[in-house]
Amino acid sequence: MLRRLSAIAILSLYSAGALASDAGFRPSFHPDQLKGPPVGRRNEVLVLGTAHLSGLPNTFEPAMLEPLLQRLARWRPDAIATENLSGLQCDFMRRNPSRYAESVETYCFDTDAAHVATGLDVPSANVEMERLLSTWPADPTAAQRRHLAAVFLAAGERGSAQVQWLRLPVQDRITGDGLDAALVEMLDKSLTRRNETNLLAAALAARLGLERLWAVDDHTADSPTPPEDEKAAGEALMKAWDNPQANARRDADKPLYANIGKVDGVLDLYRAYNRPGVGLQAYQADFGAALAEPSPQGFGRNYVGYWETRNLRMVANIREVLGERPGTRLLAIVGASHKGYYEAYLNMMHDVQLVDAEAVLR
């Protein structure tokens, strides 16, 4: 009996030691230290943390983005990635409504009108979009731009359709070539719609002569909270987010938002959101606080798992763009809380060189 107990005790010690060793393990392979390529133009990525423009005070006007647009234009990106879902991802999510119905309603562009106007569903419109872009002329006609805009809308790529609309002279923003009156009205209204995709990404792309945007957001990690847990989960997370770091973050935003209408007020906001330390502040206020949330159901850990998965998939989408187009200079515009995660994950890639946003925004 004693021998058996001793054996159990020894096994327990070995198991505890293994767990302790696992907890302290650090891999010897560090891809961030193995950068390339040795020849050829590097892939460069500038991550621009942004406020969501729809949440700015009424003193904000789109013209106030001009100092920011000028600085980004001087950097001259070849590609611009936005915090939007691709049409193909939304098509997938629509086919799985039991899990994604709420996410589709919140994040996905309704392509029904474009489907009727063009006869193309989302998958076939994406095929046509790629075909058109692969043989796109250096000097397209207005009719070609209108047709591509219609195809982009049918493909669920609303931001890219906006780029084509902006590249058309005002007198050529008319119906025809796949665009009916409803789609033209939609594109016209989007010219002044207060979000960073239209007012920043599409405007910059058109200014630089680019033909499209890259929608890299991902919501496939979304899942509905069981109804019986909704109240408890909400209360647990709200309690976690009521912390000194979150309060300090909100207090720091107040003067930035109050001064939006002043000269360089918008630029000052972007400078603040792209300073070193922003990622750690977001972690301490939000994700780190959620990770420490003590509910037995692990509500905070659920949230952090979703957040990390989403950011990994967003970065994977960016890496795919770079992998297919070596030597690309890419601007990634994303909510400021994502910035630290974007940069940390992108920096792990062999063929990605990060660019300091602070230097670009000076």
Predicted feature locations:
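Bacterial N-terminal signal peptides that target proteins for export
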Residues: M1-S6
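N-terminal signal peptide c-region/cleavage motif recognized by signal peptidases
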Residues: S15-G17
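N- or domain-start disorder-to-order transition segments that initiate the globular core
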Residues: S21-V47
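Acidic/histidine-rich helix-loop elements
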Residues: G49-P62
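Proline-aspartate-enriched helix->loop->beta-strand connector
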Residues: R76-T82
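Low-complexity, serine/threonine/proline-enriched polar segments
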Residues: S103-V170, N247-G288
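Extended, H/D-rich, highly charged conserved domains that either
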Residues: W165-S295
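A cross-kingdom marker for long, charged
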Residues: N259-R362
